[in-house]
Amino acid sequence: MLKKKYILYLLCCLLLVGCGRAGGASLSAAQIKKTLTADCSFTAEFTYDTVEGCATVEKAGEVFSITLTEPEVLTGLAFVLGPEGSQMIYGDTVIDLHDHTIHEEALAAILERTFAGTDELTVTRQNGSILATADCTFFHYTVILSEETGYPTAVSVPELSIEILISDYTPAGGTL
């Protein structure tokens, strides 16, 4: 009788252990939105059509600041996107982006939309990462998050040929 109880106990333990997820817990859409809407800073390496570059990005409240650090010819070009309006700044030149549709603005707008957290997300797991996909009217985007930290590591917008690798992601205050 004791042997049967022991085997039953061992079987239950093995079943419970088998139910655990390898590589950390999955994140819900609500948790991902909380991460995306949090104040943060990071480095973004991007490919947009034939343009490759790098930018520093800061999000504070509803204001999103993007400053290009590469390519060299665009170093210092900045975008400030917010609820009161958006601007492109280069040196002493400031352009309000009310009705302008320039190539670089689309990249900035994608980052702003992704980190606004307003789109419904479908969450899946693939190859040790968490994928959060949003379907918008004219395109869809996927945010890839680390299972280990829950922080975003990439954004992909296939219809617009935009790929963004995120590094040095730092939430304001150090942690979420």
Q: What do these predicted regions represent?
A:
Residues 1-18:
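Sec-dependent bacterial lipoprotein signal peptides
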Residues 53-58, 79, 141-145, 166:
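Hydrophobic/aromatic beta-strand elements that line small-molecule binding cavities or substrate pockets
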Residues 57-114, 160-163:
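An acidic-aromatic
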